[in-house]
């Protein structure tokens, strides 16, 4: 990539701009010195200035209700444009395909994509010779928790995951919890050898099985934002790793990192840890 491209602020489309995460992304992109808000897409308040909607003052960027119209315009720009998607599991797959089709680089924080959908998007990005980033969690603290869990798994055979989120989250278990279990499974170890013949008096009482026989328990309550515990057990001891999100600003360093790096990639990568 040329020095001119690297020195020019990165133009960013935010899809789901009025959502809880989208609002924070708009603010972060607006405030960062090397990024510039190109467009804001949402189904609500179409035509209203996104800056006024978020209390940032007039930005002269009206909220668009059509991602396709925005991508058509972005395809005409001299420098590649990045799209950040924090929308809904039912919308994100087509959003990413559309972005790639128009040469817009996707950064995705929306969870709920199936493994098959992720594989299809990876193939689509490969054919376009474009980079894309999908990360179930953009918190650097969560990446560190997963790294600590990988290390701990060398010494513990029993582990379960509890993830807790606000009650507006549509998918369960969370993409972060699934990714945590998958990263532990990639060690080639099967956890939680059975000790007794279990029976559930209420279906699902013991959680859901993820990779490597790791159970995940999901909690949805108002007052929560995003929290995860990885609990290891052994005779005479419990080892608990926990990450708590108290403000969605914690995700912004990771989002900005992905925005800055995605145009340098030639394939889809899954997980923020691959950029660190």
From Swiss-Prot:
The keyword rRNA-binding does not apply. SUPFAM superfamilies: Glyceraldehyde-3-phosphate dehydrogenase-like, C-terminal domain, NAD(P)-binding Rossmann-fold domains. (S)-2,3,4,5-tetrahydrodipicolinate binds at residues 166, 175-176. NAD(+) binds at residues 16-21, 109-111, 135-138. GO terms for molecular function: 4-hydroxy-tetrahydrodipicolinate reductase; NAD binding; NADP binding; oxidoreductase activity, acting on CH or CH2 groups, NAD or NADP as acceptor. Keywords: Amino-acid biosynthesis, Cytoplasm, Diaminopimelate biosynthesis, Lysine biosynthesis, NAD, NADP, Oxidoreductase. Coiled coil: none annotated. One of its GO terms (cellular component) is cytosol. Its main location: cytoplasm. InterPro entries: DapB_C, DapB_N, DapB_N_CS, DHDPR_bac, NAD(P)-bd_dom_sf. Gene3D superfamilies: Dihydrodipicolinate Reductase, domain 2, NAD(P)-binding Rossmann-like Domain. It is an enzyme of class 1 (oxidoreductase). Its EC number is 1.17.1.8. It catalyses: (S)-2,3,4,5-tetrahydrodipicolinate + NAD(+) + H2O = (2S,4S)-4-hydroxy-2,3,4,5-tetrahydrodipicolinate + NADH + H(+); (S)-2,3,4,5-tetrahydrodipicolinate + NADP(+) + H2O = (2S,4S)-4-hydroxy-2,3,4,5-tetrahydrodipicolinate + NADPH + H(+). It is found in: Cytoplasm. The active site is at 165 (proton donor/acceptor), 169 (proton donor). CDD domains: DHDPR_N. One of its GO terms (biological process) is lysine biosynthetic process via diaminopimelate. Pathway: Amino-acid biosynthesis; L-lysine biosynthesis via DAP pathway; (S)-tetrahydrodipicolinate from L-aspartate: step 4/4. Catalyzes the conversion of 4-hydroxy-tetrahydrodipicolinate (HTPA) to tetrahydrodipicolinate. NCBIfam families: dapB (TIGR00036). Belongs to the DapB family. This is 4-hydroxy-tetrahydrodipicolinate reductase. It comes from Thermosynechococcus vestitus (strain NIES-2133 / IAM M-273 / BP-1).
